[in-house]
Curated annotation (Swiss-Prot):
<keyword id="KW-0346">Stress response</keyword>
<feature type="region of interest" description="Linker">
    <location>
        <begin position="341"/>
        <end position="545"/>
    </location>
</feature>
<keyword id="KW-0547">Nucleotide-binding</keyword>
<keyword id="KW-0175">Coiled coil</keyword>
<dbReference type="GO" id="GO:0042026">
    <property type="term" value="P:protein refolding"/>
</dbReference>
<dbReference type="InterPro" id="IPR050130">
    <property type="entry name" value="ClpA_ClpB"/>
</dbReference>
<dbReference type="InterPro" id="IPR019489">
    <property type="entry name" value="Clp_ATPase_C"/>
</dbReference>
<keyword id="KW-0963">Cytoplasm</keyword>
<keyword id="KW-0143">Chaperone</keyword>
<comment type="subunit">
    <text>Homohexamer. The oligomerization is ATP-dependent.</text>
</comment>
<dbReference type="InterPro" id="IPR027417">
    <property type="entry name" value="P-loop_NTPase"/>
</dbReference>
<dbReference type="Pfam" id="PF00004">
    <property type="entry name" value="AAA"/>
</dbReference>
<protein>
    <recommendedName>
        <fullName>Chaperone protein ClpB</fullName>
    </recommendedName>
</protein>
<keyword id="KW-0067">ATP-binding</keyword>
<dbReference type="Pfam" id="PF17871">
    <property type="entry name" value="AAA_lid_9"/>
</dbReference>
<dbReference type="Pfam" id="PF10431">
    <property type="entry name" value="ClpB_D2-small"/>
</dbReference>
<keyword id="KW-0677">Repeat</keyword>
Length: 861
């Protein structure tokens, strides 16, 4: 017998049979070795063939093991194994069967048929397991589908549809697909295209996450329920698994053979199968190698002849990039656009999916949570599409509640830790012999007893609440299964079964659910089982960093006293503080315009009056860290070409992939304070970019992505008009301030374009600082020095005269508060540093600072 006349799978089986014989110390390869290997062969056709023929495979496997155990063993030396006479006889019989059926190569199924006819022990075992020759022959005919074995790899190409596709209609029948709500127009349009005589291959095109795959699943459900035209009623909808098709294709031509097998199977089905190719663009170039043909080109003839009835799905970008370039492939498909659903449609979709998700997580999802998921995701998650992002929100919020139910409640956990701590102390005290320790042990035992009782009671409550929840979940699962059984009975027209489920099983289960729900009516103390709008808002906050959850009392008070908090750090600029505080409060209460930034301001004033300091104080107030502020020094953008740094380089330029400085920062942190410092120093083209940010709250970066600025506060600072401010300073009356503001606005209007000024929420002119305010600022700045000294365990105590001296030295109406910082450095910090180095002050000392002869003097208290 020639080995090269066996199919590759049969050759592999023979090699594995030899290994099996060697491993079991057998000197001869018997038919049982080969049959045993064929039965366990990965991807082989022997096991499916026997199952199809009604053979009891587990019983057969036991009998084969018994036969293998009974074979004689040779140990102690390595011997060559050779085929037995019985195996050779069976191979001759297999060869004869193959030739009778017109095969060029011997396939494994003829070996199975030869064994059934055999009178040996293996044949008897097979017949004892229920094998009959006629049934085996019928199963072989079905497996081969009228084809002969003409190539070595013929066995691998068999049942290609079962191997490389997923049956969506079968999944719909078993209730494994999520319900598809709405999308009637798109499904109708898809059916319309499928019903055409030619070009009957729709391709669904839309943004990621709008529900392209869901439309195909909806079509599968309609086919199963018979809610489609007559022409589609008996068809199967299969999804091509491209990963399985490519996986393990090691040699050139192997992938093409597999795809050809799929196409041949489809041709044999004569239009009874619709093939769904998700991510259609992956077919263009798949399997492409030097001199080879890619999958896209292999599909074209089948599509043109009408042998392949296909639905594709891909995104707009991928369609343009891959499919449109191949005009011959594109013309064989008919485009069906899938748009993003509205918020109202998304709410309807979520209501339809609610039961599935509630059942999966074992929690209750309330309707306000569904509405919140749709509205909040639409407003705050801008880089993804509905309904995908809303479904993800609902899913994650339900997952969070489930996690809290499964994990130990915080109160119980705290009690348990306290108990462990006390028990450790008890063990330590048991070793002590003195009376005081014995008394403490008695007290400790009493405390442990009280805590133990409290812990046991709480744990019992927690377990009973969990059990109540799980009981209701089990009933809901039974109701879901009963509904699936009812649908299956309806399709089979089994009216007796339908009547039994509809009027017997379902009402009984619903009565049980009502009883379980009434038992749950009491408020759960430790377990929360409902997903509310608040949980959805918390998930949005975690995703985006935007605080959309309900404000706690502490935060409300904090926002109401915002002016006072900012005023403690920024002195003498009450108007600016009020304007900024109002913008933050509007944003936090949801009253600000949803299509514009939370606030956009231009701060004007001379140097050193607190423009940048107010932004730092605001960042610390909002985010507990002044590092959360996005600060851009506009003096870096003085050249025309430097504008590209803000939004990213255009295509074809170096740095295109990196994105823009401003846009990337805001994409990562959408809720932030953006400070554009010294804005008048930037090139005029920068303001053209800022126009759409200030008006629509959005900016398109170099890669075409839209970046959302609607949750940012934009502050620009400028020194324009500082000369006019200095000239009119010295009088704090409202009339003078109005006159000063008008003079400054004249300068501003001369420098900035009207369309830029018109888009700002407010232009704030900062007041010059007087001596009293400089003294206040000195106190604030000295607090920083006190903190630094505290690290060295030193305290600082300045009397009023010393503070007065620093205020006088640091006061300069032209330069604001910056000279004060220099005065503190030169008058106080330099001298104090020398004193500390000289050993005048050591850890634990208090440094008393006074004035003597117009100079600061230091003494130890």
């Amino acid at each position: 017998m020639r080995m090269d006349k066996l199919t590759s799978r049969f050759q592999n089986a023979l090699a594995d049979a030899q290994s099996l014989a060697v491993g079991r110390d057998h000197t001869i390869i018997e038919p049982v070795h080969v049959f045993s290997v064929l039965l366990d062969q990965q991807g082989g056709s022997t096991r499916p063939l026997l199952v199809q023929a009604g053979v009891n495979v587990p019983l057969l496997r036991e009998r084969l093991t018994e036969i293998l155990e009974a074979l004689p063993k040779v140990s102690g030396q390595t011997v060559n194994v050779s085929p037995s006479n019985e195996l050779s006889r069976l191979f001759h019989r297999t060869d004869k069967l193959a030739q009778q059926h017109g095969d060029q190569f011997m396939a494994s199924e003829w070996f199975v048929l030869a064994v059934v006819d055999d009178s040996g022990g293996l044949g008897q075992a097979l017949r004892a397991a229920g094998a009959e020759k006629k049934k085996i022959e019928a199963a072989i005919d079905k497996l081969r589908g009228g084809e002969t074995v003409q190539t070595e790899n013929a066995e691998e190409q068999r049942q290609a549809l079962e191997k490389y596709t997923i049956d969506l209609t079968a999944r719909a029948e078993s209730g494994k697909l999520d319900p598809v709500i709405g999308r009637d127009e798109e499904i109708r349009r898809t059916i319309q295209v499928l019903q055409r005589r030619t070009k009957n291959n729709p391709v669904l095109i839309g943004e990621p996450g709008v529900g392209k795959t869901a439309i195909v699943e909806g079509l599968a459900q309609r086919i199963v329920n018979g809610e489609v035209p007559e022409g589609l009623r008996s068809k199967r909808l299969l999804s091509l698994d491209l990963g399985a098709l490519i996986a393990g294709a090691k040699f050139r031509g192997e992938f093409e053979e597999r795809l050809k097998g799929v196409l041949n199977d489809l041709a044999k089905n004569e239009g009874r199968v619709i093939l769904f190719i998700d991510e259609l663009h992956t077919m263009v170039g798949a399997g492409k190698a030097e001199g080879a043909m890619d999958a896209g080109n292999m599909l074209k003839p089948a599509l043109a002849r009408g042998e392949l009835h296909c639905i594709g799905a891909t995104t707009l970008d991928e369609y343009r990039k891959y499919i449109e370039k191949d005009a011959a492939l594109e013309r064989r498909f008919q485009k069906v656009f899938v748009g993003e659903p509205t918020v109202e449609d998304t709410i309807a979709i979520l209501r339809g999916l609610k039961e599935k998700y509630a059942l999966h997580h074992g929690v209750e999802i309330t309707d306000p949570a569904i509405v919140a998921a749709a509205t909040l995701s639409n407003r705050y998650i801008t880089d993804r599409q509905l309904p995908d992002k809303a479904i993800d929100l609902m899913d994650e919020a339900a997952s969070r509640i489930r996690m809290e139910i499964d994990s130990k409640p915080e109160e119980l956990d705290r009690l348990e830790r306290r108990l462990i701590q006390l028990k450790i102390q008890r063990e330590m005290l048991k070793k002590e012999k003195d009376e005081a320790s014995k008394q403490r042990l008695v007290d400790l035992e009493r405390d442990i007893e009280v805590l133990d009782r409290e812990f046991s009671d709480l744990e019992e409550v927690w377990r009973s609440e969990k059990a109540a929840l799980q009981g209701a979940t089990k009933i809901k699962e039974s109701i879901e299964q009963a509904k699936l059984d009812l649908e299956a009975a309806q399709r089979r027209q089994d009216y007796a079964k339908m009547s039994e489920i509809q009027y017997g099983v379902l009402p009984a289960l619903e009565k049980q659910l009502v009883a379980a729900s009434q038992a749950e009516q009491h408020d759960f103390t430790l377990v929360q089982e409902k997903v509310t709008a608040e949980e959805i808002a918390e998930v949005v906050s975690r995703w985006t960093g935007i605080p959309v959850s309900k404000m706690l009392e502490g935060e409300r008070d904090k926002l109401l006293r915002m002016e006072a908090d900012l005023g403690r750090r920024v002195v003498g600029q009450d108007e600016a503080i009020k304007v900024v505080s109002d913008a933050v409060r509007r944003s936090r209460t949801g009253l600000s315009d949803p299509n514009r930034p939370s606030g956009s301001f231009l701060f004007l004033g001379p140097t050193g009056v607190g423009k940048t300091e107010l932004c730092k104080a605001l960042a610390e107030f909002l985010f507990d860290s002044q590092d959360a502020m996005v600060r851009i020094d506009m003096s870096e953008f003085m050249e025309k070409h430097s504008v590209a740094r803000l939004i990213g380089a255009p295509p074809g330029y170096v740095g295109y992939e990196e994105g823009g400085y401003l846009t990337e920062l805001v994409r990562r942190r959408p809720y932030s304070l953006i400070l554009l410092d010294e804005v008048e120093k930037a090139h005029s083209d920068v303001f053209n970019i800022l126009l759409q940010v200030l008006d629509d709250g959005r900016l398109t970066d170099g890669q075409g992505r839209t970046v959302d600025f609607r949750n940012t506060v934009i502050v620009m600072t400028s020194n324009l008009g500082s000369h006019q401010i200095q000239e009119l300073s010295g009088d704090d009356s409202p009339e003078v301030y109005t006159q000063m503001k008008a003079a400054v606005m004249g300068v501003v209007q001369a420098h900035f374009r009207p369309e830029f000024i018109n888009r700002l929420d407010d232009i704030v002119v900062f007041h010059p600082l007087d001596k009293a305010q400089i003294k206040q600022i000195a106190r604030i700045q000295l607090r920083g020095l006190e903190k630094r000294l505290a690290e060295s365990e030193l305290k600082l105590d300045l009397d009023d005269r010393a503070l007065e001296l620093l205020g006088n030295v640091g006061f300069d109406p032209v330069y604001g508060a910056r000279p004060l910082k220099r005065a503190i450095q030169s008058q106080l910090e330099n001298a104090l540093a020398q004193q500390i180095l000289a050993g005048a002050f050591v850890s634990g000392d208090t440094v008393q600072v006074g004035v003597d002869g117009g100079k600061l003097v230091f003494s130890k208290v």
